[in-house]
Each structure stands twice: as C-alpha cells, then as structure tokens.
Amino acid sequence: MAEGIVFDADAVSKDIAEGIAAIQQASTMEELKAIKAKYAGANSAMTRASKAIGSLAKNEKKEAGKVMGKLRADFGRAYGTKEASVKAAQEAAELAAETVDMTLPIRRKPLGARHPLPKLMEDVEDFFVGMGWQISDGPEVETEWFDFDALNFGPDHPARQMQDTFYVKGNQSKDAAGFVGSNMVLRTQTSSDQVRGLISHGVPLYIACPGRVFRTDELDATHTPVFHQVEALAVDKNLTMADLKGVLDKLAVAMFGPEAKSRLRPSYFPFTEPSAELDLWFPDKKGGPGWIEWGGCGMVNPNVLRSAGIDPDIYTGFAFGVGVERTLLLRHDINDMHDLVEGDVRFSEQFVMGE
C-alpha cells in the first residue's frame, strides 16, 4: 500500500455492515434515503475508500477493488430489496385506506323534486297520446276572433269585457277570414287552439290542447290570474254524448284511480250544445267519497264547426275541458292555490322524483 494512504478494508466492511443492518430496520422511504446518503453518499466511508484505491500501489489496487466491489454490491442488494418491500407496504396501506367498505350503510343523497303541475300536465298528455289523440299547442297571445268569435261568443258576451279578459294594447291582427282589426288578447281558454286545429288539419280530428290561460282573477285560495287548462276536441262522423261520457270516465280513472267516475249535469256554454257540467266522484275526496265539480263539456255547437268550414250536417263532435290546478288540488288534497304559484321549494319536496 502506498505511503500515507489509509485503506482499511476491515473498517469499510464494518461500516457497510452497520449500513445494511440499518437498512433492515428502516420502515419508510425517507429512512432508507437517509441511510443511503450516510453509507453510500459523497461523504461516506465507502466513497472515501473507493477514491483511496487510486493512490494504492499497483499490486494492491486489484485486491482493494475486489473488496470494494463486493461491499458496494452487498449494500446495493440489501437496499434494493428493502426499497421494494417498503414501497409494496406503502402501496398496500394506501390501497387499504382507499378501499370502500361495502358493508357500510350508504349516505343517501336527497332526491330531486319537480313541481307537480308540469308533471300532472305530462300525465294528462300521456293519457290522450295513449288513446291515439294528437297534442296541440297554440299561441298564448291570441286573436279575439279565435278566442271568442269562432267559439260562438256574441259581441256583447260578458267574457269579452276588460274586467274578465286581458287585452294586448295596440296590437291588431288578421282573423281567420282575413279581415284586419281583430284585437289581440291573452287567451282565456285553450279552446281557441281547437278551432286552429280544425282549420289546419280538417276532420276527422282528435286533439288535446293543454296550456296556460289568463283571466283577470285575483289570486286567492281557489283562483289565480294565470292557470292551466287541458281542453279536448273530437270531431268525426256519428259522435254522440255517449262517446263523450266514455272518454270522461276513462280520464277520471286515469287521474283519480279505478273507483273514480264521472257524471254530467245540464248547463250552458256558447261553444257546445247541449252542454254539461262535469262532476267527479272519487273515494279520496276531502270530507269523504262524493261528487265535486271538475270541468265543463258538451257536443260542439254547429256554429263552431261552421267557423272552421266544417259541415255540421255531416260531422259532429264533443269537447271538454278541465283545470289542471283544480285537478291537482283534488288529487293531492291541496288547500290553497298559493302553494302552487309561490315557488316554495318545501312544497315541491313533497313530490320527489319517482313518486
């Protein structure tokens, strides 16, 4: 060994043995990295000894190189084995922490809730579609001709007065006959769309007309100035009141259950003749099973058919209408119309999705 150069193989071997022992005791990657820096880093005994080999005599270098190569390999093998073991343990611990325990009770998310009014509108539309009828959607800003004249309302009928109907200021349009000067109104009934259907599609015709209508009513427990109707019209050859009654019975069952039924009481409407009030019987009526007014109906007045260019000597028809809000009030025993229009989410939450 060259003079002045200290190369103590036993000391290096002892130091590496301590490093390997420390590796065996390590449990984290941080501990392993610290051990590697101490026993194999730039300032470690192993690194200093490796540098010292270059200063040894030629005949001593080969033997010293073998010693250092074996020590370096022993340390590297111990470090690599332990590193793989620690990483595997850490990954297993992370996986266990992230694993979902399928036996734990789930956290239920609150179900969404739709407002019951559009849901009921869809139910009514589905009823008519199931019978093969068409769904018609007309304009809410309507000509006075379609809303009144074509439906056999006389020029002096009380419904035309401003205390009952919203007139659109400054707007005039052509009526179905092409005459300019028909005032525009917010439609008071979806019956106006029935006349449009007759003119557009001709006969035979089976349509349901759901939609929003407007009256100058004050908002109270049973009235609102903006509400929804579903009106239905059937025009064909040889239709009678018996056909009307059959459809009404089916609608009552669809809306209120298998025990529900309908009855007709004589009445008057300008657009039907004969006309009838539609009463509903159902077992869940507030106060006990019984009859309650539901809507209006009748055979289409011949004058209405003539307005649409239909010959009443060949075709007959029936029509009826029910209020969607009223149906909802009866169906769910709701006491106040305010609940339907004020947008209180607590009200809608009673009608969660799927119910």
Curated annotation (Swiss-Prot):
One of its GO terms (molecular function) is phenylalanine-tRNA ligase activity. It catalyses: tRNA(Phe) + L-phenylalanine + ATP = L-phenylalanyl-tRNA(Phe) + AMP + diphosphate + H(+). Gene3D superfamilies: Bira Bifunctional Protein, Domain 2. It holds the Pfam family tRNA-synt_2d. Disulfide bonds: none annotated. InterPro entries: aa-tRNA-synth_II, aa-tRNA-synth_II/BPL/LPL, Phe-tRNA-synth_IIc_asu, Phe-tRNA_ligase_II_N, Phe_tRNA_ligase_alpha1_bac, Phenylalanyl-tRNA_Synthase, tRNA-bd_arm. PROSITE patterns: AA_TRNA_LIGASE_II (PS50862). Its main location: cytoplasm. Binds 2 magnesium ions per tetramer. Its cofactor is Mg(2+). The keyword Magnesium applies. Signal peptide: none annotated. GO terms for cellular component: cytoplasm. Its EC number is 6.1.1.20. Mg(2+) binds at residue 273. Belongs to the class-II aminoacyl-tRNA synthetase family. Phe-tRNA synthetase alpha subunit type 1 subfamily. PANTHER family: PHENYLALANINE--TRNA LIGASE, MITOCHONDRIAL, PHENYLALANYL-TRNA SYNTHETASE. Tetramer of two alpha and two beta subunits. This is Phenylalanine--tRNA ligase alpha subunit. It comes from Bifidobacterium animalis subsp. lactis (strain AD011).
